[in-house]
Amino acid sequence: AVGPDVSLFKPGDEVFYAGSILRQGTNSEFHLVDERITGNKPKSLSFAQAAALPLTTITAWELLFDRLGAVPGKSVDPRTLLITGGAGGVGSILIQLARRLTGLTVAATATRPESQEWCLDLGAHAVIDHNKPMKEQIEALKVPPVALVASLTFTDQHYKAIAEFMAPQGKFGLIDDPPEFTMSAFKGKAISVHWESMFTRSSFQTADMIAQHNLLNDTADLIDKGVLRTTMDQTFGTINAAHLKRAHALLES
């Protein structure tokens, strides 16, 4: 069903979205969602496969293009993007977007061999271990200057080390809530700091909310063309108390 003022969709359209944190979540069969943060579901994916995409994809897309200012469609970009926690949900989408839509050199961090292999399989040019000195590893790669950083997890543990090898006047983006974060670490190099929160537009009803509708449609098109792929790991089937309990336990692990 659609409301009387809806113009982007009609009854029966298959859609995907991340919703809003200002109302109850999605542990239910029916949802009420603003059309401006809703996209047309990729035709080549099941609903479960599509449902795994909006939260991480909107975050990755906004972080890369809106916050860090990467240029889509630019075939050559003489800079390196470093993604910490590249094997996670956001990182897995971010690697794909950066490799397929920009000319950036993409380096990711991961510790386990299987996580490192996953990052490379998604398209990362190189992977380093964030539990080892990163500056030496970056220098050994001989990649272009690290001008853009997407810090996705444990920012408080790594940002000072990253600031040491970032290029002057670079951009440092993050999505987590570090308990300790000192901006002065970036002052000497005039590095700007950018937080990304994909619920900002819906929470504050920003004038550009429609951007999320557009990027979800662009994502669906890229999925259907085989440029991007879903990162769904597993599905539990029908919505019921037992399955929700299992799913939440997995998320919390």
Predicted regions and their residues:
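Hydrophobic beta-strand signal
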Residues: F16-Y17, L32, L82, G173
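A glycine-/small-residue-rich N-terminal strand-loop-strand element
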Residues: A1-S20
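Short, flexible surface segments
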Residues: L8-P11, D77, P168
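Mid-domain Rossmann-like dinucleotide-binding core that forms the NAD(H)/NADP(H) cofactor-binding site
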Residues: A51-K132
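C-terminal hydrophobic helical "lid"/dimerization subdomain
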Residues: T206-S253
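Glycine-rich cofactor phosphate-binding loops and adjacent beta1-alpha1 units
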Residues: P72-S75, L122, V127-E196
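A structural motif shared across PLP-dependent enzymes of the aminotransferase-like
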Residues: L22-E35
